[in-house]
């Protein structure tokens, strides 16, 4: 069974960090089956310098080092059994509009919507710095991005979200159940 968690933003990264610490104690166990063999984690954050995202990556790397060392040990151990795979969705930000204003300038209807929903200050916030407590600013960004995923796949461009979807599809093709959790504000 594939188990996946998609975490959005800095708060989502805090949830991923808690998942890493919970995995240390084998908190993800199925009754009668023991600890989950693996969790596949995807961090989605446009703020490349987000401290929360960096912290969870470091915690997951340290966890995997400890898990691998314990797995190689000939002794039984009561924790660190679940393999954690964490990746950050890069979203090819360099190929995207830098702000709501720039994105709206590309599409007339998006421009009308942006002028209606957002102040000029909000619309000029740079995506590379995150949404600064305004998750609604990401609506146009993510709508544009998700709409381009299949084009990216067709062009052979690597993408972490497409890769996760491919793993989910492979699980389903093998007749396995897929469970997806999400963490966001």
Where are the language model's segments positioned?
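Conserved small/polar residues in nucleotide/adenosyl-binding loops
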Residues: 183-185
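Segments that form or flank anion-binding pockets
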Residues: 1-178
């Amino acid at each position: 069974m594939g188990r996946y968690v998609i975490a959005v933003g800095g708060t989502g990264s805090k949830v991923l960090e808690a998942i890493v610490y919970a995995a240390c104690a084998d908190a993800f166990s199925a009754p009668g089956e023991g600890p989950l063999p693996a969790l596949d984690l995807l961090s989605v954050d446009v703020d490349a310098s987000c401290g929360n995202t960096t912290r969870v990556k470091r915690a997951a790397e340290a966890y995997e080092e400890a898990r691998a060392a314990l797995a190689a040990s000939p002794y039984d151990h009561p924790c660190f059994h679940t393999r954690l795979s964490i990746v950050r969705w890069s979203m090819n930000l360099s190929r995207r509009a830098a702000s709501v204003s720039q994105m709206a300038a590309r599409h007339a209807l998006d421009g009308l919507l942006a002028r209606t929903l957002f102040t000029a200050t909000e619309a000029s916030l740079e995506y590379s710095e995150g949404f600064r407590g305004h998750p609604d600013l990401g609506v146009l960004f993510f709508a544009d991005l998700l709409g381009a995923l299949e084009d990216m796949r067709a062009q052979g461009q690597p993408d972490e979200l497409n890769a996760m979807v491919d793993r989910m599809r492979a699980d389903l093709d093998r007749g396995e159940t897929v469970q997806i959790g999400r963490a966001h504000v």
